UniProtKB/Swiss-Prot annotation:
One of the Pfam families matching this protein, by short name: Peripla_BP_2
Protein name: Uncharacterized lipoprotein MJ0085
Keywords carried by this UniProt record: Cell membrane, Lipoprotein, Membrane, Signal
GO cellular component, one term: plasma membrane
Lineage top rank: taxon: Archaea
Lipid-modified residues, S-archaeol cysteine kind: C21
SUPFAM superfamilies associated with the record: Helical backbone' metal receptor
Gene3D superfamilies xrefs: Nitrogenase molybdenum iron protein domain
Organism of provenance: Methanocaldococcus jannaschii (strain ATCC 43067 / DSM 2661 / JAL-1 / JCM 10045 / NBRC 100440) (Methanococcus jannaschii)
Length: 373
C-alpha cells in the first residue's frame, strides 16, 4: 500500500513539474505588450514594401492631390506640415482647402507644385511618423526616405487621374489602413461608386441618336486655355454617357483642336470650364463671327462648369459637374436633382463642409453663360 502511495505521489510530482515547464514555455513564446512589434509592413502604389508604425499620429503630404486624399479620410488632425503651394495658391479651385483654412497655418515642408520638391530638413523638424507622396519618381521617393529616415508611402490617382479608377481606391484603402481610417476609406469609395452608378443608371439606356452632341472648352492643362482646349473621354461626360464630339478623335485625355474642327462638329451644347472662361470671353470679343456661327452660341446653349482639374483631380467637383451636365443634357432624367444642392451634398461628405457658395462667388458656378454680341 505504501509503495502504491509513493508511486502515485511520484507521478503527481512529475505531472505538476511537466505542467509548470509547459506554462513557462507558453509564457516565453507569448510576447508581452512591450515586446509586440509596433510596426507593420505595407505595399505602396509603386509596389514598394514600407515598414510604418502601427500607430500613426503625425503625417505630411507631398505632391499634387496628396493632401486632398487625407482630407477625404477625415485625418487632417494628423497633418503637421504642408507644401508652400497649399498656402500661397488661392483655394477656390480646391474644395478641401476652402473647407480647411487651418491647414495654411502649418509649417512649410517643401515647395510643392506639379514637380514636388520636399525639403528633407523641414520635414524632419516637424517629426512626422509617415510621409505620403504622389507624382514623385521612384528614385526621388527612395532618396527622401533615406535622407529623412522616415517611411515614405506612395499614393496615386491613376494614369489619367479620372475619378473612377482602382489606383485611387487602393490609395484610399492604403492610407486608411495606415491612419486607422479603414472604415472611412470604405465609406468614401462606396460614396464615389454610388454617385457613378446613379449617374450611369439615369442615362445608360438613352440611344445615341436621341442625345444632343456636347463639347467642353477652356480645359486647364499646364496653365489656362481657351475654347480650343478640350478633352476626349472627358470624365464628367463619360459619367452621364454624353455624346462628346471630341471622342471622334479616338484619343483619351487632353487635346487642343482648331476652331475649324469645332465649327465642323458644331455641337448642340457647349460647356466652358470656368478656369478658362476669361480667355473664352476675350476671344469672343475678337472672333464674334466664329462663335456666332456655332449653334450652341446662337441658341444660348453654353454653360459654365466648375474647374475640377487643379492640383490633379478634385473628385467632388468632377462629380458635381457630372450632375449639372446631366441636368442640362437630359433634364427629364434629372428632374429630382438641384445641381447646387447636390454639389454641397458631395462636398460635405468628402471635405466636411458645404463649399459650393464660395466656389460660385469666385468662379461663377453652374449657370448659362451670356455672351453679348
Amino acid at each position: 500500500m505504501l509503495k502504491k502511495l509513493i508511486g502515485l505521489l511520484t507521478i503527481l510530482i512529475i505531472a505538476v513539474g511537466f505542467c509548470g515547464c509547459m506554462e513557462q514555455n507558453i509564457e516565453k513564446q507569448t510576447p508581452t505588450a512591450s515586446e509586440a512589434p509596433n510596426t507593420i509592413k505595407v505595399v505602396d502604389l509603386y509596389g514598394r514594401e514600407v515598414e510604418v508604425p502601427k500607430e500613426v499620429n503625425r503625417i505630411v503630404c507631398c505632391g499634387p492631390g496628396c493632401l486632398r486624399l487625407i482630407v477625404y479620410l477625415n485625418a487632417t488632425d494628423k497633418v503637421v506640415g504642408v507644401e508652400d503651394t497649399e498656402k500661397k495658391w488661392t483655394p477656390w479651385t480646391r474644395p478641401y482647402r476652402i473647407a480647411h483654412p487651418e491647414l495654411a497655418n502649418l509649417p512649410t515642408i517643401g515647395q510643392g507644385g506639379p514637380c514636388p520638391k520636399p525639403n528633407p530638413e523641414a520635414i524632419i523638424q516637424v517629426k512626422p511618423d509617415v510621409i505620403f507622396v504622389t507624382y514623385m519618381p521612384k528614385d526621388e521617393v527612395d532618396a527622401l526616405q533615406q535622407k529623412t529616415g522616415i517611411p515614405v508611402v506612395v499614393l496615386s490617382y491613376g494614369q489619367l487621374a479620372t475619378f473612377n479608377n482602382e489606383d485611387l481606391f487602393k490609395s484610399l484603402e492604403l492610407a486608411g489602413k495606415i491612419l486607422g481610417k479603414e472604415e472611412r476609406a470604405k465609406e468614401v469609395i462606396e460614396f464615389i461608386k454610388n454617385c457613378q452608378n446613379d449617374l450611369n443608371e439615369r442615362t445608360k439606356d438613352i440611344p445615341d441618336d436621341k442625345k444632343p452632341s456636347v463639347y467642353v472648352g477652356g480645359i486647364g492643362y499646364k496653365g489656362l486655355h481657351g475654347i480650343d482646349s478640350t478633352e476626349c473621354k472627358y470624365p464628367p461626360f463619360v459619367a452621364v454617357n454624353a455624346k462628346n464630339v471630341a471622342d471622334e478623335l479616338g484619343k483619351e485625355g487632353h487635346v487642343f483642336v482648331t476652331k475649324e474642327q469645332i465649327l465642323k462638329w458644331n455641337p448642340d451644347i457647349i460647356f466652358i470650364d470656368e478656369g478658362g472662361l476669361k480667355l473664352v470671353v476675350e476671344d469672343y470679343k475678337r472672333n464674334k463671327e466664329f462663335y456666332n456661327s456655332l449653334k450652341a452660341f446662337k441658341n444660348g446653349d453654353v454653360y459654365g462648369l466648375l474647374p475640377y482639374n487643379f492640383y490633379t483631380t478634385n473628385i467632388g467637383t468632377a462629380l458635381a459637374d457630372a450632375y449639372y451636365i446631366g441636368k442640362v443634357v437630359y433634364p427629364d432624367r434629372f428632374k429630382d436633382i438641384d445641381p447646387e444642392q447636390k454639389a454641397d451634398e458631395i462636398f460635405t461628405f468628402l471635405v466636411g463642409k458645404p463649399v459650393y457658395k464660395e466656389m460660385k462667388e469666385k468662379l461663377g458656378g453652374f449657370k448659362k453663360l451670356e455672351f453679348s454680341s
